[in-house]
Amino acid sequence: MKAKRRILLQLLTFCLFLLLLAKIHFRNHQEEELLLSDWFNPRRRLDVITTTDWLAPIIWEGTFDRKVLETYFRKQNITVGLAVFAVGSLTDKYLDPFLQSASKFFMPGYRVIFYIMVDKYLQLQEMEHNPLQSFQVLKIGKERWWSNFDLMRMKILSEHIRDHIRYEVDFLFSMNINMVFQSEFGVETLSTSVAQLHPWWYFRKRTNLPYERKPTSVAHIPFGLGDFYYAGAIIGGVPFQVLDFAQQYLKGVFLDTENGVNSTYEKYLNKYFFLNKPTKLLSPEYSWDPTFNLPRHVWFVKIAHHPIDTL
């Protein structure tokens, strides 16, 4: 009888110990959790839309506290990936300005892996050494659908995410090559799913947004529906989220092709974010076309997205 009591007492003591450990873990987790209100203040920018209907933040200059974000993310010991495709005639003109500016302004102070997808042997230009940055030049082959650049890009990107990128980085961005960073693109942009607002269509009426209107297309968004119009120049998030978009895009293109329907990469992107709401939106400051007049809403251009052949 005494032996049974001793065993019960030991079990009770062990259970209490586990509860104590769980309480300590929960408290520590609470202390480490970063709340939106800790770093984001939409009231500082009453001149623009700063929060979506589903309560995702829209990042404008003045709305975020980078010091709070830096304190949090440095404890997380993160690595961020940036993928860019340098193929054909675009490489010679656009790659060097992209990489030179990105090495200076993209996630400074954090480990960064640049994934450069190329269709031919490439010797990178010399850049200032940064021990936190590394470069992977990844050769891609030409296949029968290679002429469809966006299809090729998403297929190759999805393969690399599955094969190795998901094990190497915590967050991943894919950007167009004809972009030049002009100021810091920092940790305020990090989230599970990141979408870029279109610099032209953001300032237009929602009824005029150029969604896919053909009902037979996978990318179709009916009239009267839709949230924003997203630009295809930047997509980001955690690797599995970027992979999910790439896979859904490829699936949509193949289904439409089988049915004799054509659409565009950006329209598939907008359909994806209509169904799968992004957790963070980047304002037009993060992908501004320098040929546009600068409106008063845009305080600082983070990236200049140059039209092809104007850089």
UniProtKB/Swiss-Prot annotation:
Gene3D superfamilies: Spore Coat Polysaccharide Biosynthesis Protein SpsA, Chain A. The keyword Glycosyltransferase applies. InterPro entries: Glyco_trans_6, Nucleotide-diphossugar_trans. GO terms for cellular component: membrane. The active site is at E266. Substrate binds at F85, A86, V87, G88, S89, L90, N176, I177, N178, H198, P199, W200, W201. It is a single-pass type II membrane protein. It is an enzyme of class 2 (transferase). The gene is Glt6d1. Its cofactor is Mn(2+). One of its GO terms (molecular function) is hexosyltransferase activity. It comes from Mus musculus (Mouse). This is Glycosyltransferase 6 domain-containing protein 1. Belongs to the glycosyltransferase 6 family.
